[in-house]
Structures are given as structure tokens and as C-alpha cells.
Amino acid sequence: MNILAPVRRDRVLAELPQCLRKEAALHVRKDFHPRVTCACQEHRTGTVGFKISKVIVVGDLSVGKTCLINRFCKDTFDKNYKATIGVDFEMERFEVLGVPFSLQLWDTAGQERFKCIASTYYRGAQAIIIVFNLNDVASLEHTKQWLADALKENDPSSVLLFLVGSKKDLSTPAQYVLMEKDALKVAHEMKAEYWAVSSLTGENVREFFFRVAALTFEANVLAELEKSGSRRIGDVVRLNSDDSNLYLTASKKKPACCP
């Protein structure tokens, strides 16, 4: 029985969404990894379509984490929002290259007194979104500690990182240029992809979350292919012979499009 909501028409991805700035991107390919495209075409994505991928959103109080999520999930902006207590989450369903894919977006509290509660929900994240206010230099500096706290509960080598500057609508062009320079430096140090958004106007919000969904999906499919490949390599059949014991690795012939 399928208990997940159907995929909305505006959540269908047939192409790889592009990064905002090539100077700070997880990768700059124009298309999905060839192995991912091939696996989707041949329906070899394993359990990816049944999994729910966890994405946590962290950052200082009032940087706009909740507004960012609400703008994408509900297409709303509430100027009189209340600070998140502990954690909250939204579920978003996508279809990527014909495969269903779900993201669970965890909105965590930025207040110090709720930090210990929120941190218990960090574990198992496949992507971490660190949000700062483009008009507040201190909030950018604090992103380093937020990331460090989140990585205590996750494997740094297997999680995707995104550094997101919010409230772009409040920055003058000159102010933004200066802040972006610092933000790109921080993103490079973190090995994170940089984005700048406005939850008020909606600028870059949709594009950003589509990028998160696409890259998380891509990572999931590649991991699934790696696991299935390991299982085939490990499937060893022992053959008895008069002269010696021979070992033959039983493996299926790979499709021509997948190296």
C-alpha cells in the first residue's frame, strides 16, 4: 500500500538543475552522472524510489530557516512567524528521471536552549543546509560551528553540504557583492555549494531545493549501484577440479551504457 503523497507536476525533474556559482559548487556537470541516467532508463535504481532522504536545515535564530522551507513547500511567506521550538519537518515528493524520490526537510531551532534537542535529530542526514543572513556577518561566521555540530552525528564523507545566504532582498547590490565574497570563501572551506535566496520574493528558492533534490537523488543512486556491484563481486562460486580448486566470480554482464 502506497502511503506517500503523489508527486506534484511542478516537482518533476527531467534534467539536472544547475549550480548558482561555479566557484562554489559540489560539481559543475551539466547533466546527471552517466551511470545514474543509465540506471534510471533501465529501472536499476534499487530501493531509491522507496527511501526517504533526510535533509537538515541549521543556522542561527532568525536567519530565515522556517521561511525558506515554507516558501518552497507551501509557497507562503509569513512576516510574523514564530521561532521553531525544537524541530519540525516537511515532506516533499519529487520525480527525478522518472523515479519517485522523497525529501524530509528538518527545520531545527536556532536558539541555544533548544540546541541539545535539535542535535538529536541531526543523525542520518544525507544533506545539510547551513543558513545565514546575508545582512549579518556574525551569522556567516557562526555557520562553521553549526556545521561542526551537525557533522558530529554524520559521516562527513557521505553528506552533501549547502551554504545558503537568506534575505537577499534586504541587501543592496554593493552590500551583496561584499558578503558574497566572504560567503564563497566559507563555502570553499566547508566544501559546500553556495546559494543566495530570498524567501520574501522567492528568488532562487525553487531552483535551490530542486538542486538539493537532484544531487541527493544522484548520490543515492550511485550508492545503490556501488552496493549492487559489491554484491556481484562478492558472489564467488567454488568449482572442483582434479588439478586444483578454481574460483569463479559470478557476475552478470553489465549493460553497454554503464561502465
Curated annotation (Swiss-Prot):
The modification N-acetylmethionine is found at M1. Its main location: cytoplasm. Keywords: Acetylation, Cell projection, Cilium biogenesis/degradation, Cytoplasm, Cytoplasmic vesicle, Cytoskeleton, Golgi apparatus, GTP-binding, Hydrolase, Lipoprotein, Magnesium, Membrane, Metal-binding, Nucleotide-binding, Phosphoprotein, Prenylation, Protein transport, Transport. GO terms for cellular component: centriole; centrosome; cilium; Golgi cisterna; phagocytic vesicle; phagocytic vesicle membrane. It catalyses: GTP + H2O = GDP + phosphate + H(+). It is found in: Cytoplasm; Golgi apparatus; Cytoplasmic vesicle, Phagosome; Cytoplasmic vesicle, Phagosome membrane. A motif (Switch 1) lies at residues 71-89. Its cofactor is Mg(2+). GTP binds at S62, V63, G64, K65, T66, D78, Y81, T84, G110, K167, D169, S198. Switch 1, switch 2 and the interswitch regions are characteristic of Rab GTPases and mediate the interactions with Rab downstream effectors. The switch regions undergo conformational changes upon nucleotide binding which drives interaction with specific sets of effector proteins, with most effectors only binding to GTP-bound Rab. The small GTPases Rab are key regulators of intracellular membrane trafficking, from the formation of transport vesicles to their fusion with membranes. Rabs cycle between an inactive GDP-bound form and an active GTP-bound form that is able to recruit to membranes different sets of downstream effectors directly responsible for vesicle formation, movement, tethering and fusion. RAB34 transports protein involved in the redistribution of lysosomes to the peri-Golgi region. Plays a role in the maturation of phagosomes that engulf pathogens, such as S.aureus and M.tuberculosis. This is Ras-related protein Rab-34. It comes from Sus scrofa (Pig). The lineage of its organism: Eukaryota, Metazoa, Chordata, Craniata, Vertebrata. The gene is RAB34.
